[in-house]
Amino acid sequence: MFNIDEIYTISNFLFLCNKTIEDKIPTCWLQGEISNLTRPESGHWYFSLKDSKAQVYCVLFRFNQRHIKFNPKNGMEVLVHVTPTLYKARGNFQLIIQHLEPVGIGNLNLAFEQLKNKLVNEGLFDNIHKKPLPNIINTIGVISSSTGAVIQDIIKVLNNRYPFSDILLFDSMVQGQGSVKKLTNALNAADQSGKCDVIIIARGGGSLEDLWAFNEETLARAIFKASTPIISAIGHETDTTISDFVCDICAPTPSAAAMLVTPDRLELLANTDKLYMRLHQSYQQTLHDYQSVLNQLKLRIPISNKQIAFFSQKLDHVSINLNNHVKSTLVLNNAKLNSIFSALKQHSPIEAIKHIKILNQVSFAQLKHQIKQIININNSALYLANEKLKKAIATLTDKHKTTLSIQANSLHHLSPLNTLSRGFSITTNAKNQILSSITDIKINQAITTQLADGKLYSNIKKIEKN
């Protein structure tokens, strides 16, 4: 069929390869696990069929689906009747599915359910073990791939909502061989660093195989033992892993996890403005209240304020005079000492030194006595001024109290209520207008009579003139 000396076009070569496959390889039965299942609008199903060592691309056309009574899913172990062929447009080897039937649950799904049941029985998923998020989150640890889109999505959300947070990335593989060990080591490093307020484990969506590292028991137990709150953000909303069950909080997506650990910047600014306005209003009200009290006090004791100012000024003058007197006395005695020291330098006898010492002691005693007298005089003056001020304030207060009492009595005697207590009454019409003449009212109109201890409500039946 093939001529080694002939130069083929790509399409001719693939046609011959496909014909060889279809002629030499008959239809056959295969058993494997469904993976990467997609169902486009055309109605055809595309998926991979795999075992532990290999996988092959499969197509189940729409017209071959009429006898299938179940809904194929990823991870399902199936038995298929296939025809091998070569898809000439891309040169891909593929299997055309003629018949499909389930064998039982797929190996990965079975392993998932077995580990899930085991950890449930041990209590690893119980709510009592879930750690709450701290009230204030400053540093966020992220376990993900540094080259993936997930970390960029998280950074974008954090910068938009709360750019003050610190992000510590603990780079790790998120799928494939060795990814479980990398993820576990990254989690332990983040938890033991003591720098993270919360840790997000994140990766994008994928098939069951792509997400399998997050279904391993080693990682699940590391999440359970961590002292830092853990948020799982693995795959899309429809993806579920063992890590989702054992973590403290499960977020539907990595972006949602970033929103969980940060406040909204605009909301914080709005709350800050509200708090500032409340504080400013409270401050203004308090200031206004104290100003009102101060004004009332000024009105009540205007004379006392003048007296206080007078005695305060007098005290200042006394203090100034005292300081000046002390300074002049010190200057005078320093001059005397300088004169004595000059004479001492000229004569330098021991008796002169003794004499100078005595003079110095006498001068110091005199100075001390003078200062004490001045202080006593000023203390007496200050005490007398203070007593005089107290008496003036008391006198003024009593005077105002007496005036207020007289005015209160006058108001009491002039009060209509006091008149009522002596047997009089006040009558008003329906409009609450006081009636002073019979011409102000008509037959059948309602009136109200105010007595000292209550009111009477009446209707006019008859009117007589005096």
UniProtKB/Swiss-Prot annotation:
Pfam families: Exonuc_VII_L, tRNA_anti_2. GO terms for molecular function: exodeoxyribonuclease VII activity; nucleic acid binding. It catalyses: Exonucleolytic cleavage in either 5'- to 3'- or 3'- to 5'-direction to yield nucleoside 5'-phosphates. Keywords: Cytoplasm, Exonuclease, Hydrolase, Nuclease. GO terms for biological process: DNA catabolic process. One of its GO terms (cellular component) is cytoplasm. Belongs to the XseA family. Bidirectionally degrades single-stranded DNA into large acid-insoluble oligonucleotides, which are then degraded further into small acid-soluble oligonucleotides. This is Exodeoxyribonuclease 7 large subunit. It comes from Ruthia magnifica subsp. Calyptogena magnifica. The gene is xseA.
